[in-house]
């Protein structure tokens, strides 16, 4: 169970994904909404605020073999290192995580790669840090090799349809990172090719709709799936997302445990298309995972 309940922390949502054209149409709704912002909490304009959510993730064993502290950073859409990004860096350092995960859309332009370089330089350097691609890295035309090298310089491993295994206090852990559902070609079979079953399996997919559209092999059950992409709707007065990007599926934010592996959808940090968040405060997600 989570120790911090998010506004969208529920098991089902009826909203489907939309295209970039629909996103722009939704941004137009902002003109009518923003003048009311701040009048009530549900309409608070919150692009510069930051919340931290903490979650306990149960494992397969009644008695955990070890515990893993995980931090998820998603959807930075990094354009500068300002006050929000400084607060985020402080909280990442304070978290003393065993594992830092970057779940896509860290930048949306080649012009901002140097800000990403600076941000990663100031992040704590952990023995294990992983990143996956989002839709914006591909839409921006950033060469994959350039991203791989940039991440490597700061101790982060980019996973594109690939799995990596490591140990924590004798417990074996697998992290599987998929290509983006919207802009790439996620391939679960390729990511798990030649892998033996493991008692602790973490799946990273930028778009949460991957949970419903990809076949996960029964011999490789997933204990925790982490996604971003939705921004919690970004413009979500009173907690109701007006528009969701294609690839969101039925997911907005928070926990989903029905009909698949336990999924957490992080609201992320930045914004896209319009530099405003309403009712969808930026989020750093932290997990304490009980390992089998």
Question: Predicted segment positions?
Answer:
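N-terminal secretory signal peptides
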Residues: 1-18
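Beta-strand-turn-beta hairpins that frame and shape the catalytic cleft
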Residues: 58-71, 164-175, 257-262
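Membrane-embedded segments
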Residues: 69-149, 154-157
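Binuclear metal-dependent hydrolase catalytic cores centered on His/Asp/Glu-rich metal-binding motifs
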Residues: 141-156, 162, 168-213, 277-278
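Conserved beta-sheet core of the metallophosphoesterase superfamily
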Residues: 208-288
